[in-house]
Design a protein with these regions (language model features):
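Flavin-dependent oxidoreductase catalytic core characteristic
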Residues: 1-345
Length: 345
């Protein structure tokens, strides 16, 4: 019979499709940063430095957020390939060792996140003083909704609001924790250290919100093939929904999401798997990464996985002769006592 395809198993979809959605979210985030850097450089040359703190905070945060996501994602892909995932034939070990160092070079990720947190604390202080917050961080000053209006349709507007609520709440809690410690007599640096985990949570939520909101904005202004847009919309929705379910405690902590709404999210995720499945391979191929770069027996354009694994095994040095040399040097003497130099027991 026909061999079942790995992607038809829901457990594989649950692990791999959110990573596919993440790849698209990070792609759009990268495009945003490239444009922001180019425009920011021109403004700096003109002496316009107002947006520099926000650009620094966002770039530092995305460096950490994206490298964490990539390194964890490669490991999930490797596990999904079973034993072959640990072989160099899969190409995944090479990707893993090239991605993981990004978590520490050019700034260890925790330090990068705390730089974001420092900027967010300044924004929160400005909000308390009645100052207008710039650009993307303006959500911190918005009047928070106590309950989500999300229904089974899971509109992008409701999903983004959920991420805004989570980030704003975590920022406020971190700021109040620091203020409480300082008022209790702790020096500022000590209060910062004792609040650093909450500060990290706040910065991470801020970066996650950016990736979701930026992805949504790109999808909503996209034009062209309607069917392609529908698929991209499903990918974006999966990224948003899965992100909430993976960090559910931070979304239901203060009762913002109800049990019924969580049920909507779970059912939607499984439905989105069905929508994305027929297009999953095409969505990966759209990145147009050639086989020569991937060097993978598993992730191949022609799909000839078994033949590729066989050919890879034939190239191994130990498989260059029909009988390995160790047979003549070690095994055959043991099997022929008359010519053996080994002592008899």
């Amino acid at each position: 019979g026909i061999e079942p395809q790995i992607l038809d198993y829901q457990t594989q979809q649950y692990r791999l499709f959110p990573l596919l959605a993440t790849a698209y979210a990070l792609y759009f985030a990268g495009n945003y940063m490239s444009t922001a850097y180019s425009e920011g450089s021109q403004k700096i040359e003109k002496g316009q430095l107002e947006e520099l703190p926000q650009l620094h905070a966002l770039s530092a945060g995305l460096k950490a957020f994206t490298s964490y996501a990539a390194s964890a994602g490669v490991e999930v892909c490797r596990i999904c390939c079973g034993g072959h995932g640990y072989s160099h034939a899969s190409g995944l070990p090479k990707i893993y060792v090239s991605v993981v160092p990004a978590c520490t070079y050019e700034g260890e990720n925790t330090v990068m996140m705390l730089q974001v947190a420092r900027y967010l604390m300044k924004c929160y202080k400005d909000k308390q003083q009645g100052s207008k917050l710039p650009g993307f961080v303006s959500y911190i000053a918005e009047i928070p909704e106590k309950r989500s209006g999300m229904d089974e349709h899971l509109s992008f507007n409701c999903l983004v609001k959920a991420y805004k609520h989570r980030a704003a709440r975590l920022i406020e809690e971190a700021a109040k924790q620091m203020q409480s410690l300082i008022q209790s007599g702790s020096p500022a640096h000590e209060a910062w250290n004792k609040s650093s985990v909450q500060l990290f949570w706040a910065a991470n939520a801020h970066c996650h919100l950016f990736c979701v909101q930026n992805f949504v904005e790109n999808v909503e202004r996209s034009s062209g093939n309607t069917k392609t847009n529908e698929v991209l919309k499903a990918v974006c929705q999966l990224y948003s929904v899965h992100g909430i379910l993976e960090n559910l405690g931070e979304f239901i902590h203060d009762g913002f999401l109800s049990a019924q709404q969580v049920d909507y999210l779970q059912k939607a995720m499984f439905k989105l798997f069905e929508v994305i499945r027929p297009n999953a391979v095409a969505l990966v191929d759209a990145f147009d990464i050639p086989d020569q770069v991937l060097q993978s027996c598993l992730g191949r354009y022609d799909g000839q996985v078994y033949q590729a694994l066989y050919d890879y095994a034939k190239m191994a040095p130990m498989n260059q002769t029909e009988i390995h040399s160790t047979y003549y040097t070690h095994l055959r003497p043991l099997m022929n006592p008359e010519t053996s130099n080994y002592s008899k027991l």
